[in-house]
């Protein structure tokens, strides 16, 4: 079928984990590639995760949780536009020829002419392409210190990076293409966010009485860069 497909879903994962008396860890890798019901509709992502917690001494514990992901965010699928001026492969005649006499894709499969000639996604697809997606690094680092007299201190910081890319081009060699549609579109942006948390806790039991007090300090920042 030139328009629809039996979408294939692929999801692969591998992981390892382990623990000792003082350290436990986990690491995983994954890849996903999903196809939709329409030709050209697809999504893919690569992801990984690492977690580690360690008891360094009787009074110090540290940990880290790191997530990485690179995923697509756009595709160029067969056009099924609903307006009468939109390209739509379903409007082609059953007798339309998608190839010319030399076996190459025919731009106008119903008549070979621009006027009422139909639409061939596969001919046009030779002249444009798209790369669009996100790369994300999410991290959390923490430490806990046990202090005398029932006091403890905990520190958490969570930096997050996100990169976005959008690269599209249409060749001027595409016959009868609109001058406004030809050319290149390039977009890039980066986000950097972080938040941190400092917590001091006092937990003490006096006879039948249990006292708990907590002091918390938090801070965060969001930064954004773009060439658009």
Kindly give the residue locations of the regions a language model identified:
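Outer-membrane beta-barrel channels and translocator barrels
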Residues: 9, 20-21, 57, 146-148, ...
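Short strand-turn segments of transmembrane beta-barrel domains in outer membranes
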Residues: 1-15, 28-41
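Periplasmic plug
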Residues: 26-28, 63
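Short coil-to-beta-strand
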Residues: 21-25, 166
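Surface-exposed loop/interface segments of Gram-negative outer-membrane beta-barrel transport/assembly proteins
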Residues: 1, 36-43, 47, 51-138, ...
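Short glycine/proline-enriched loop/turn "hinge" motifs that connect secondary-structure elements
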Residues: 16-21, 171
